[in-house]
Amino acid sequence: MAIARLIVENFRNISAVDLEFDHGFNFLVGNNGSGKTSLLEALFYLGHGRSFKSSVTTRVIRYDQPHFTLHGRIRELQHEWSVGLQKQRKDGNTIVKINGEDGNKISDLAHLLPMQIITPEGLTLLNGGPSYRRAFLDWGLFHHQPNFHSAWSALHRLLKQRNAALNQTYDYNMLKPWDMELAKLAHQVSQWRADYAEALSPEIEQTCRLFLPELDIHVSFHQGWEKDTDYAQLLTENFERDKAIGYTVSGPQKADFRFKSNGLPVEDVLSRGQLKLLMCALRLAQGEHLMAQKNRHCIFLIDDFASELDETKRALLAQRLQNSNSQVFVTAISPEQLKQMQPEKHRTFQVVNGQIEQLL
């Protein structure tokens, strides 16, 4: 999978650009604030329907414009798609088009464009709350298990309804029919997560040994309640407690994917540089797992490539990315920061105040 062409209009400080990319490496070079991260953000938005920097739509749309528009041409093997996304300032409405047809969902775009992003802020995958690590697992399942997205959506809808009902009823029999359905979905989603975590864990640990040979990294999945406990029974037993607190305490919404080094949480013992390498290892292992299992290449977006990595580690990451045969977008302040990442075929773009030009 690769983005062959991207048109961006009125996205942050980018008024209008029309760019053609290499199917391998694409370098975005410019000073801080020039717009290189904004281009990565536009690429991410096209593949996720949201920003990785802000949840406020008005901050993404260029200050004096009613909307932003993204158009892309995507290629995979012998297939090609045109995709488009427009976000309105006034009502926040999102329009998604695939091959010129309306009525598509953001999830349709996400399926077409499997993306991994590595940013300085991405350490929340390791030192943030469990929700970041659930999202990591669920990204993989979205691309590996065709029924996961619908089951996940139904699960969250039922949890929301149950939490609302907890504040309105004193009789558990009113909740029991919902809880039976909730328990079924919880077991299915948790089993998918457990199976995926089990399949991915050896690849993560192997990649960690390459990037961080001085450390012994182990991963483990926790489903959100005791492993051998029946979830339907647990919901019944916890009704009074859940009602007192106002929400469902246990369940797949509390799942976690934990990382430890020598028996201790990695966020407590690793330096920021080591955490960044571990984050890179996780993203790479997940992208490579997708390729191995589904024969689909992931697109990698890397912001501030040189940050907190020495030259040896930069070269190691660059070589692993080259070996993946994936499309890669990398930002840097200067070309010198990219000298470890110079494949024979690549494209370099200079970014200045929202203007982007390819360097020959």
Swiss-Prot record:
- MF terms per GO, please? ATP binding; single-stranded DNA binding
GO CC annotations on file: cytoplasm
Binding positions (ATP)? 30-37
Provide the alphabetized UniProt keywords.
Answer: ATP-binding, Cytoplasm, DNA damage, DNA repair, DNA replication, DNA-binding, Nucleotide-binding, SOS response
Q: Which residues form the signal peptide?
A: none
Q: Which InterPro entries match?
A: DNA-binding_RecF (IPR001238), DNA-binding_RecF_CS (IPR018078), P-loop_NTPase (IPR027417), RecF/RecN/SMC_N (IPR003395), RecF_2 (IPR042174)
The answer to whether keyword rRNA-binding applies is: no
PROSITE patterns, A to Z: RECF_1 (PS00617), RECF_2 (PS00618)
Mainly resides where?
A: cytoplasm
Among Pfam families, the record links this protein to:
SMC_N
- Keyword DNA damage listed? The answer is yes
Q: Which GO terms describe its biological process?
A: DNA replication; DNA synthesis involved in DNA repair; double-strand break repair; SOS response
Location within or outside the cell: Cytoplasm
**Gene3D superfamilies, per database record:** P-loop containing nucleotide triphosphate hydrolases, RecF/RecN/SMC, N-terminal domain
Q: Which family does it belong to?
A: Belongs to the RecF family.
Q: What is the purpose of this protein?
A: The RecF protein is involved in DNA metabolism; it is required for DNA replication and normal SOS inducibility. RecF binds preferentially to single-stranded, linear DNA. It also seems to bind ATP.
Q: What's the protein name?
A: DNA replication and repair protein RecF
Organism from which the protein derives: Mannheimia succiniciproducens (strain KCTC 0769BP / MBEL55E)
